[in-house]
Amino acid sequence: MYKQYFRLREEPFNITPDPRFLYLTAQHREALNHLLYGIRQRKGFICLTGEVGTGKTTLSRALLRELGETFHTALILNPVLTDTQLLRAIVTEFGVETKRRDRLGYLSLLNEFLLKVNSAGQDAVLIIDEAQTMTVDSLEQVRLLSNLETERQKLLQICLLGQPELRRKLAKPELRQLAQRITVRCHLDNMDAQDTEAYLRHRLSVAAESPDTPSVHFDPGAIREIYRFSGGTPRLINAIGDKALLAGYVYQTGQIDDRLARIAAAELEEACPSA
């Protein structure tokens, strides 16, 4: 609705995890570098945690882009599956055509695929999002996948993404073997006020028809209100930013001030009281 008015090619605050819109704060850049290091050095297990909306999924998309074509990747977005369903999902994500099999059949297929990848001098990476939703048994199943190896190296690098509950779950005695195998751990916090401002400007620049001459501007008062309401959580910044642009369109102004930001925040709070 407001794209044409503000001369935007696309909506700047869409909540889909598009790496083009990824703004790397210092902590996001550090986390990405740690993930890349762990995978490229074949460290086996990697764990990234953060509160809801801090950018874990978007960071995983950036990770996939950074890895390049020499890495075969499988991304599991909904890991609430049985052991057999999880193995089938992993095999399918790696692009291996398969008919319905039992657990051992999928495991054999996965092992064959990983050996072929390894013999070609390439690597395979499994990324599991929302890993905190997995049962202890499912996490143990994932641990067993790390036993797929040659005499020299692991065949599969595994990256677990999840909310802070994942860390608490991994601390359980029955998962101590898995916890001991995690060699790289990262945690994402919410952004501070300065990063919130830079984040807003970055997304507007990416979406603008003319990035050097933006037709809409969030003034310092608006940025303070957005930070106060969102607490620096990217997902909430996106939600209030989108509604603030809509308010600017309604009031026919390209200057988003604290009043419009408060209007946007109030609308969001009314629609989603838990926001």
Question: Which residues does each predicted region cover?
Answer:
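A short, basic N-terminal segment
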Residues: 1-42, 275
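Conserved AAA+ ATPase "SRH/arginine-finger" region at the nucleotide-binding site
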Residues: 76-80, 170-173, 183-196
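Sensor-1/coupling segment of RecA-like P-loop NTPase cores
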Residues: 47-52, 58, 105-109, 133-141, ...
